[in-house]
Amino acid sequence: MRVALRVAYDGSRYHGFQYQPDVPTIEGALRKALSELGLELVGYASRTDAGAHARYQVVVVEGDPELAQPDPINARLPKDIRVIAKTEVHEEFDPRRDALRKEYRYFLGPLNRPEAAARAARKLEGKHDFSAFRREDGRNPIITVERCELVEITPNAYVLRVVAPRFLWEMVRRIAGFVWEVGHGLREEGDAEALLSGKFEPSKKPRCLPAEGLILWHIEYDEVRFERTKAWFEDHKVIQLGGRLLLRLPEGAESC
């Protein structure tokens, strides 16, 4: 049996999840910690962008299951990366392909027109061509967004929830950019129809908001249940990600 680990991290100091030589990455830190215990990382659920965060990343490791425990791994990790739960999985389990759906959240801060922004978000639900909401990567742009909703978390501070079976490169950040633009009167909510038609002017694509406001919030699997551990409670602050994200506009949103 392999072991799946649920990992939370504050990505502020890292150049994304995927390993890169000579720069700090989440995968690099995990591989180093795991190797000291004779464990090997063999798969992960999502390749988050530089600066993005996660409260529900899933990685799969091979090696002695008795050593694949949160406490010894966390003792070898930086404090802004925590293994908070584990479970045993079958040998064929693929944390990316076996995911039923993922939820991302983007912290938008205050909005001048929250009602219009909320309606704009809802227009993106359903099966659409999301070519206008991605950086080109050759993948099929037809995606069914199961939920896209604006939630007020404190007075005039908003978070965008987006749930789908899969996502395109920069998709959530551009969806957030569209909702943010509507929320500040820079675009009309009715623009959604043209953007989702697949026939749009490239210059009209929504802005891509900075990754620092983005959190991989949840991943749903069939029959995979994680055991919460002591690390869940002691290091829960890592996945709260800070009031610094909630009440201000993400850096660079005005100019990107």
Swiss-Prot record:
It comes from Methanopyrus kandleri (strain AV19 / DSM 6324 / JCM 9639 / NBRC 100938). Its EC number is 5.4.99.12. One of its GO terms (biological process) is tRNA pseudouridine synthesis. It is an enzyme of class 5 (isomerase). Substrate binds at Y104. It comes from the Archaea. The gene is truA. Belongs to the tRNA pseudouridine synthase TruA family. Formation of pseudouridine at positions 38, 39 and 40 in the anticodon stem and loop of transfer RNAs. It holds the Pfam family PseudoU_synth_1. This is tRNA pseudouridine synthase A. InterPro entries: PsdUridine_synth_cat_dom_sf (IPR020103), PsdUridine_synth_TruA (IPR001406), PsdUridine_synth_TruA_a/b_dom (IPR020097), PsdUridine_synth_TruA_C (IPR020095). GO terms for molecular function: RNA binding; tRNA pseudouridine(38-40) synthase activity. The lineage of its organism: Archaea, Methanobacteriati, Methanobacteriota, Methanomada group, Methanopyri. It catalyses: uridine(38/39/40) in tRNA = pseudouridine(38/39/40) in tRNA. Keywords: Isomerase, tRNA processing. The active site is at D49 (nucleophile).
